[in-house]
Amino acid sequence: KPKEDKEWEKFKVKHITSQSVADFNCTSTMNNPDFTPDGQCKPINTFIHSNTGPVKEICRRASGRVNKSSTQQFPLTTCKNPKRCKYSQSNETNYICITCRDNYPVHFVKIGKC
């Protein structure tokens, strides 16, 4: 099988959560060591409330490296503006634009269509 893309593995950790919007806490999530590799709080991060299947599906027929828009809207939480690593969070439901590489999502480009 093709190597399960390392960047896809990272993408899943950084941007996909199985938690519901109601249960999701930006501050506790963003203070996880995955998000603070150098001890710094990441200024902003968007989470997709979904299992991995529908997100990976966006890249299903994307060979090479290309930005793709989702055809469905996802519930999203954006964590931002940490003051001493305490985050504000905002929720919305929207399309997402991601970078695909050889059928795997590898980078979150933005909320909304590409």
UniProtKB/Swiss-Prot annotation:
EC number of this enzyme: 3.1.27.-
Listed SMART domains: RNAse_Pc
Family affiliation: Belongs to the pancreatic ribonuclease family.
Record key words, sorted: Disulfide bond, Endonuclease, Glycoprotein, Hydrolase, Nuclease, Secreted
Disulfide bonds: 26-79, 41-85, 59-100, 97-114
GO cellular component, one term: extracellular region
Protein name per UniProt: Amphinase-3
GO terms for biological process, alphabetical: defense response to Gram-positive bacterium
Organism ancestry: Eukaryota, Metazoa, Chordata, Craniata, Vertebrata
Chain residues that bind substrate: 42-46
GO molecular function, one term: nucleic acid binding
Pfam family, one: RnaseA
Protein function: Endonuclease, hydrolyzes highly polymerized RNA, poly(U) and poly(C), and the dinucleotides CpA and UpA. More active towards rCA than rUA or rUG. Has cytotoxic activity against cultured human submaxillary gland carcinoma cells.
Presence of the UniProt keyword RNA-binding in the record: no
PROSITE patterns cross-referenced by the UniProt entry: RNASE_PANCREATIC
Origin species: Lithobates pipiens (Northern leopard frog)
Entry's localization field: Secreted
